[in-house]
Amino acid sequence: MGHYVLNHEYKGLVEIGVVVVIAFAFLHWGINFSLKRWGQKWDVRGITDVAVLPLAVIVFSLFFLVMTPVTNTITRTMEFEADMYGLNAAQQPDGEANVDLMLGEYRKLDPGPVEEFIFFDHPSGRTRITAAMRWKAGHPESASADEVARPVFAKQ
């Protein structure tokens, strides 16, 4: 729900759209550079020659490989904003921390900063738990997970 309320679908389209426009500019530059340098050797006559397609795939792939940390950061930032929205809506930081610990069974909880920057498209468990505990420290009136769960699971 946080993604919807925070308009992440539109922000994401714009931000990734900018990356794609830059990708096509890089593709144009990369193909022209390669054709000037190796076009005769490869017997590729120009950018309109169908033989340029493998080169286009390679240039595009290299661009997005290098841009992976940027695209992951775009996604990770929106995920963190949605997490904060969820904490403000539910006001259950202990529940958030418990869920993040459960997610740690199949996902690394405490990556290094470089590892998180390059490979993680969502905040790490450590980042999410730390944010939940900071939120809890700033909102002492919030309910703990036990207080919320007791009425639901109490025997009658």
Features from the language model and the residues they span:
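A Zn2+-metalloprotease active-site environment signal
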Residues: 2-88
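Active-site-proximal gating segments in proteases and membrane effectors
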Residues: 67, 71-77, 81-156
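Short, strongly hydrophobic alpha-helical membrane anchors
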Residues: 1-4, 154-156
